[in-house]
A protein has these predicted regions:
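An acidic, low-aromatic, low-complexity terminal/linker signal
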Residues: 1-193
Length: 193
């Protein structure tokens, strides 16, 4: 049986009174990286936790007509339209079977707003020293999306650069879909007086 998945929000990861935010500045290159490790299409990958707003179980998605195949749908997250991207289709991996443990990783700062990645499951949150990350050559990854590799135990993990998951034209198209979905959400919402 898969491990239990906990819903985590960015605010629960950073406290304003945290001692890490005080004291002398430390070069980011010596700090360890905290990564959200996930499985998708038979592959294991990770993104920096600083790009993750929340990790949540699969939810009901709107599927407006005309969505590209790489979009599973639009998530209504507290009144905000969040496009849900299928990495298995984008990276041409084995087709992902959606199930009880399918998970959404909601990220900020990747497109012009939020975007969610639909993955098989998030398996763990790990801390990795920068010295344990092997770089991936610029020409070994489409759009330099895979920016490094590391191992945890015997498991090889591909590190993804969230800002490079989509090409600029794909981000523009995604932003247009997001704006359209946001307008539709507003049209159907009931104004509270």
């Amino acid at each position: 049986m898969p491990d239990k998945v906990t819903v985590t929000t960015r605010s629960s990861l950073q406290r304003p009174d945290s001692p890490l935010q005080k004291g002398p500045e430390i070069s980011p290159s010596v700090l360890p990286q905290v990564l959200a490790v996930f499985e998708v299409g038979g592959q294991v990958a990770a993104i920096p936790i600083q790009n993750v707003e929340r990790i949540t179980p699969m939810a009901r998605l709107a599927r407006p007509p005309g969505l590209p195949a790489v979009l599973e749908g639009i998530l209504n997250l507290a009144g905000t339209a969040v496009p849900v991207l299928r990495l298995d289709r984008l990276f041409q991996l084995g087709e992902q079977r959606l199930g009880l443990y399918s998970t959404l990783i909601v990220m900020q700062g990747v497109a012009d707003g939020r975007i969610a990645l639909l993955v098989d499951r998030v398996s763990q949150i790990v801390t990795v020293a920068h010295s344990e990350v092997l770089p991936v050559g610029k020409h070994n990854s489409f759009n330099e999306c895979a920016c490094g590799m590391t191992t945890v135990g015997e498991q090889v993990i591909h590190l993804l650069a969230p800002a490079r998951i989509l090409l600029a034209t794909e981000r523009k198209t995604l932003s247009e879909f997001q704006e359209m979905a946001q307008r539709r959400l507003k049209e159907w919402s009931i104004e509270k007086e």
